[in-house]
């Protein structure tokens, strides 16, 4: 059985003090029944050591990693630096990185491979824009992303997140059955039954139970709703 993964992406939010306060409120809210679920907190670089140092029912993830181990890459971070901070997971290819920082499928692939070379588990993000969706080519677009992003990547040490870009931070939510259909298509295309496939896009307490009841959705990648302890705890404690 594939494990359930609940990942919070804090993006560029939370100072160290705010992260500490979040943990104090969040950890006691996790129900004992959630122990078979993998909870991941992907904080900003400045909070990663703090998240690792605190005892809690969660793993630590980063939001970016470079394709090189060292070099003149101002502002970037190498995988071994993340490992030293107690990081186990890293988001790669998020739509915001692709849009604002010009990441391409080629650089995403290089980041994925280097992360795995250092025993990090990447969370690969793929998804379509509103225009791609309206043109009816969502599946073709995502298959193309997967083919280019996953070259030489070890599927046994990978998580894939489907994030319809039109639903990120917009309040629009992809219908659960449609999200499940796309996740099933992704699983079939990568031809590896064991890879966890998450849904990301305006996930909130109000829709988590319906999303997690879907057969091909193994978890969620949560943005805004992961910033508040009570909200994210309800997501982690989903009921199906």
UniProtKB/Swiss-Prot annotation:
Care to name a GO molecular-function term for this sequence?
A: triose-phosphate isomerase activity
Q: Tell me the active site.
A: 94 (electrophile), 163 (proton acceptor)
Enzymatic reactions: D-glyceraldehyde 3-phosphate = dihydroxyacetone phosphate
| Cystine pairings recorded for this chain | none
Q: Does the keyword Cytoplasm apply?
A: yes
Per UniProt, the keywords (alphabetical) are:
Cytoplasm, Gluconeogenesis, Glycolysis, Isomerase
Q: Where in the cell is it found?
A: Cytoplasm
Give its E.C. classification number: 5.3.1.1
Which positions does UniProt annotate for substrate binding? Answer: 9-11, 169, 202, 223-224
* CDD domains cross-referenced by the UniProt entry: TIM
Q: Which Pfam families match?
A: TIM
**Which GO cellular component terms are attached?**
cytosol
- List, alphabetically, the PANTHER family matched: TRIOSEPHOSPHATE ISOMERASE
Q: In which family does this protein belong, per the annotation?
A: Belongs to the triosephosphate isomerase family.
Q: What does this protein do, in the record's words?
A: Involved in the gluconeogenesis. Catalyzes stereospecifically the conversion of dihydroxyacetone phosphate (DHAP) to D-glyceraldehyde-3-phosphate (G3P).
Q: How does it assemble?
A: Homodimer.
Recorded hits in NCBIfam families, A to Z, give:
tim
UniProt-recorded name of the protein: Triosephosphate isomerase
- Organism of provenance: Gloeobacter violaceus (strain ATCC 29082 / PCC 7421)
């Amino acid at each position: 059985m594939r494990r359930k993964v609940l990942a919070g992406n804090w993006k560029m939010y939370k100072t160290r003090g705010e992260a500490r306060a979040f943990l104090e409120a969040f950890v006691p809210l996790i129900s004992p029944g959630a122990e078979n679920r993998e909870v991941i907190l992907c904080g900003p670089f400045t909070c990663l050591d703090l998240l690792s140092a605190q005892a809690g029912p969660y793993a630590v993830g980063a939001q970016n990693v470079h394709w090189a181990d060292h070099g003149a890459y101002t502002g970037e971070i190498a995988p071994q630096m993340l490992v030293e901070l107690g990081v186990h997971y890293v988001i790669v290819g998020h739509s915001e990185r692709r849009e604002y920082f010009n990441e391409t499928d080629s650089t995403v692939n290089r980041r994925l491979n280097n992360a795995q070379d250092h025993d990090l588990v990447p969370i690969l993000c793929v998804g379509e824009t509103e225009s791609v969706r309206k043109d009816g080519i969502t599946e073709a677009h995502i298959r193309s992303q997967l083919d280019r992003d996953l070259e030489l990547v070890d599927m046994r040490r990978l998580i894939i997140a489907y994030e319809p870009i039109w639903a990120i931070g917009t309040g629009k939510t992809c219908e659960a059955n449609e999200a499940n259909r796309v996740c099933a298509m992704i699983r079939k295309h990568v031809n590896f039954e064991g890879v966890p496939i998450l849904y990301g896009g305006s996930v909130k307490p109000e829709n988590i139970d319906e999303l997690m009841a879907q057969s091909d959705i193994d978890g969620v990648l949560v943005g805004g709703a992961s910033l508040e302890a009570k909200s994210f705890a309800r997501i982690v404690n989903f009921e199906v």
